[in-house]
């Protein structure tokens, strides 16, 4: 960093709705313990958020209607900008905040494309500022204890990391903002999907735990993926993928917003002498030959989210703390870009879909998805390698030399 910010970090926030609520909570938590001063907020929907805006103003925090206006008004008086914004704004706002001399906490994913990530990396180097990315599960000690155990070979040579995530979402989930379920919005790539949004944390954990060094992610050299769409959206809502890393570790991912069963995301780390099983908000278990040896708690969602800004503020105050930087987060964006560029989105036929009106809204569900997903995860298979009638096999693709998004996506294909 170019210089050290004052002991009291002066922070500004962009957005207080949606995920912005969590960033507001994080900032207020750090302010309460005397480590952060809230100096400004950009809120474009001030009428809708009148209560929060009034509260901020009463606390002496100026509220702006425009991001650029806020940066200009706070020039030289802000150390950190929090960006819980839409994916399409991550890169331009991060670069602008860095140019204004501020450090940045940007929500995950870091950006939609590799080119944008590389712009952020270059801007960070020029500004000599920090950029932290909100992959919250990597900020807690549990993630690093697991990484230490993997690198130490406690369960033998690492063979496979398997992620299973099932969170059904109603139609309203995809209409909650201008970018949900979209490939492009506001003239920019967004590439929204389960693995670039709700499940991004868990794919990032898999890449991190498969990485060869304590603070690096795995390099994926080959990818095979099946993308499916049951909802009326541009992107996909269901996925199975198989990746191979440069160290010959297999990464498997199974996820959907279009099933019946809701279950906490689970990551299974398999070595040739045992496993580590991590379950979201519950525990991680160290086992050998199916017998549990040790079990440790996984922090709650609240504690995990609060740890992000806590870690960044500590780092800015010169204290040792881990943060997810752009170079680490880039591994996730690289996989997202390869998925969209190299594999088609298969549109599930209506004969394979059930539509149900429930208390939380209208749900579109792929028939027998839950059993197919469970079978695939059990057998380390893709959906097309089960008896799922809607599944379509694809070819494995090399990612050798894949370092930029070519700005074109394979067409959607209807599944009979």
PLM ranges: what are they?
Residues 138-223, 229-232:
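Predominantly a Rossmann-like dinucleotide-binding segment in NAD(P)-dependent oxidoreductases
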Residues 1-59:
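N-terminal Rossmann-like dinucleotide-binding module
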Residues 197-322, 336-341, 350-416:
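Contiguous beta-strand/loop segments that form the cofactor/metal-binding neighborhood of enzyme cores
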């Amino acid at each position: 960093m170019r210089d050290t910010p004052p002991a009291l970090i002066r922070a500004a926030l962009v957005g207080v709705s949606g995920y912005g609520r969590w960033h507001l909570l994080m900032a207020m938590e750090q302010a309460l313990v005397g480590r952060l001063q809230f100096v400004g907020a950009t809120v474009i929907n001030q009428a809708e958020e009148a209560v929060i805006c009034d509260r901020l103003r009463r606390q002496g925090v100026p509220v702006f209607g425009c991001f650029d206006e806020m940066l200009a008004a706070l020039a030289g008086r802000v150390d950190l900008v929090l960006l819980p914004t839409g994916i399409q704004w991550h890169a331009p706002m991060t670069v602008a905040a860095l140019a204004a001399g501020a450090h940045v906490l940007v929500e995950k994913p870091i950006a939609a494309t590799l080119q944008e990530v590389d712009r952020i990396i270059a801007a960070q180097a020029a500004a000599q500022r920090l950029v932290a990315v909100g992959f919250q599960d990597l900020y807690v000690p549990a993630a690093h204890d697991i990484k230490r155990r993997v690198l130490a070979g406690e369960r033998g040579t690492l063979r496979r990391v398997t992620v299973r995530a099932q969170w059904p979402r109603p139609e309203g989930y995809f209409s909650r903002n201008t970018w949900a379920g979209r490939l492009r919005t506001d003239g920019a790539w967004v590439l929204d999907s389960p693995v670039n949004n709700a499940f991004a944390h868990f794919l990032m954990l898999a890449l991190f735990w498969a990485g060869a060094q304590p603070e690096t992610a795995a390099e994926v050299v080959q990818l095979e993926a099946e993308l499916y769409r049951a909802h009326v959206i541009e992107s996909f809502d269901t996925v199975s993928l198989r990746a191979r890393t440069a160290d010959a570790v297999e990464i498997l991912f199974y996820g959907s917003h279009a099933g019946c069963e809701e279950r906490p995301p689970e990551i299974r780390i398999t070595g040739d002498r045992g496993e580590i099983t991590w379950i979201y908000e519950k525990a991680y278990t160290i086992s050998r030959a199916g017998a549990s040896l040790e079990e440790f708690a996984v922090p709650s969602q609240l504690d995990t989210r609060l740890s992000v800004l806590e870690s960044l503020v500590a780092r800015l105050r010169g204290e040792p703390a881990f943060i997810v930087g752009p170079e680490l987060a880039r591994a996730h964006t690289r996989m997202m870009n390869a998925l969209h560029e190299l594999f088609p989105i298969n549109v599930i036929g209506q004969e394979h879909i059930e539509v149900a009106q429930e208390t939380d809204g209208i749900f579109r569900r792929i028939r027998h998805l839950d059993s197919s997903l469970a079978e695939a995860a059990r057998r380390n298979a893709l959906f097309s390698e089960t008896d799922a009638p809607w599944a379509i096999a694809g070819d494995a693709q090399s990612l050798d030399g894949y370092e930029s998004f070519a700005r074109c996506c394979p067409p959607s294909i209807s599944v009979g």
